[in-house]
Amino acid sequence: MKSTQTPSGMPIHKYRPFHEQITVDLRDRTWPARRITEAPRWCAVDLRDGNQALIDPMSPERKRIMFNLLVRMGYKEIEVGFPSASQTDFDFVRSLIEEGAIPDDVTIQVLTQAREHLIARTYESIRGAKQAIVHLYNSTSVLQREVVFRTDRQGIIDIALEGARLCKRYEETIPETDVYYEYSPESYTGTELEFAAEICNRVVEVFDPTPERKVILNLPATVEMATPNVYADSIEWMCRHLDRRDEILVSLHPHNDRGTAVAAAELGYLAGADRIEGCLFGNGERTGNVDLVALGINLFTQGIDPQIDFSDLDGIKRTAEHCNQLAVPERSPWAGDLVYTAFSGSHQDAIKKGFEAMAVDAAAQGVTVDDIPWAVPYLPVDPQDLGRSYEAVIRVNSQSGKGGVAYLLKADHSLDLPRRLQIEFSGVVQAKTDAEGGEVTSAQIWSVFQDEYLPAPLDRVEEKWGRFELTSTRTSSDMGGSVSLDVVLRDGDEVREASASGNGPIAAFLQVLADQGVEVRLLDYVEHALSASGDALAASYVELEVEGVRLWGVGIDEDSSTASLEAIVSGVNRAIRRTVREPELAAV
């Protein structure tokens, strides 16, 4: 088939491909052959990079709530602010320290530019902390050098080195605090690799780390400029060209301008990085920082401990939404309201069968489903492991099929419909969704099921159930196995007693109906208890042929025999309603 696409007419001449701006040439790359086997070191930057991007920056109270959340989740390195840039950030850092809010195993991180008065203020803010990371940065990209700073490479190196020396000097003013260092060549992705390596190596010499006290070199995609594989190539290249690699933690800080921050972080980690900075749910400047939730749960679904607790994901989301005053989108990876929801009929059917297969496998092994590998189509994670329920997994609209409808009836009402009944009832629901549009809830599906197959609920007793209603039954059997059935049957407005015999209650009741002029043939019969308890209700499903019409009936009763007779009444009444309805429709 020939493509019919045409030129867009957009001004593509204004933009240069990345490879014409920055050369990243690593033809002997090794990262594609590697696998992720353990979690990286994490640093949550919600309170700094995330907060500065908010329309309504966090109040001190919301900041404390966010900090406490990050601590509870298990983050051990948390960037808490830019204390030299605002009094609010300075006061927040001081409150954490003075109020003893920082656990001993958590290290706060503070950001500073490479200017003396800002560095001095930064050290003043962390005085008294048990330990802290001072994060020094200056911009190194070609564009920033030419447009913002109007200086050459040496001028940028001088800024970084002077900043590093000042940090070492001011460290002496807070001997009670164990200070670690991080350096970021900001706009790294727009920086020539050889220059990025040169400036990083020069800064490392000033900080003079050891294998026991490593320095963090953060290589940010301040603006995402290329595909994730290019970022990974640059990280592997840098790891090869850092002079004191065993004394360095290589950190990633991807932004999401091109929508591939998660992929960039994962590939960059494969390429040799040790650490990743990001925000919960991808908050941050422009399109956001890399999403720490997506990264962590991606690991979890591969059987790798993220070392972060996501077991109350809805609670985490609610807290983040409160603090950021931003909603997490419904389709946000792993956390959105619709992530574990299937509307498609084929998806619903596959999910239903997946749950059933896991139950069978677990029973065969004599264990619970939590003790066997998770294997449900379209659900790469068990929602319950993240604190979600199965209630919203299957939702029904006009695109749904029998699987979703059957799943909801089984999950919410313990009704395990035979396959052909699933098909029949899904058509009833489909007609409703086609007529009314939108989503049909589980409660609405149950109401439709009752209206179609069961007597009217007690609060709707004025509504007629149909032509026939079984009001009482009594059975007896003789030594030859024949069953005698006595029933009280309402037929329209008349109530009459009837009796018949057969090789069982069902055969006898079919004879009762034949005596009333209704010919019924039984095609299939299925029953099950609605629970495992001894006093459980029984559900019966019968497939009938009534006056040449094939359809199903459903009965629910404490007595399984009575349930089967009620199922026959259900099917017969449905057949009669259908024959009455069709001429009316034809007349219209």
Swiss-Prot record:
Its cofactor is Mg(2+). It is found in: Cytoplasm. The keyword Disulfide bond does not apply. It is an enzyme of class 2 (transferase). Its main location: cytoplasm. InterPro entries: 2-isopropylmalate_synth_dimer (IPR013709), AIPM/Hcit_synth_CS (IPR002034), Aldolase_TIM (IPR013785), IPM_Synthase (IPR005668), LeuA-like_post-cat (IPR054692), LeuA_allosteric_dom_sf (IPR036230), LeuA_N_DRE-TIM (IPR039371), PYR_CT (IPR000891). Residues 40-314 form the Pyruvate carboxyltransferase domain. Keywords: Amino-acid biosynthesis, Branched-chain amino acid biosynthesis, Cytoplasm, Leucine biosynthesis, Magnesium, Metal-binding, Transferase. One of its GO terms (cellular component) is cytoplasm. Its EC number is 2.3.3.13. Catalyzes the condensation of the acetyl group of acetyl-CoA with 3-methyl-2-oxobutanoate (2-ketoisovalerate) to form 3-carboxy-3-hydroxy-4-methylpentanoate (2-isopropylmalate). Homodimer. This is 2-isopropylmalate synthase. It comes from Clavibacter sepedonicus (Clavibacter michiganensis subsp. sepedonicus).
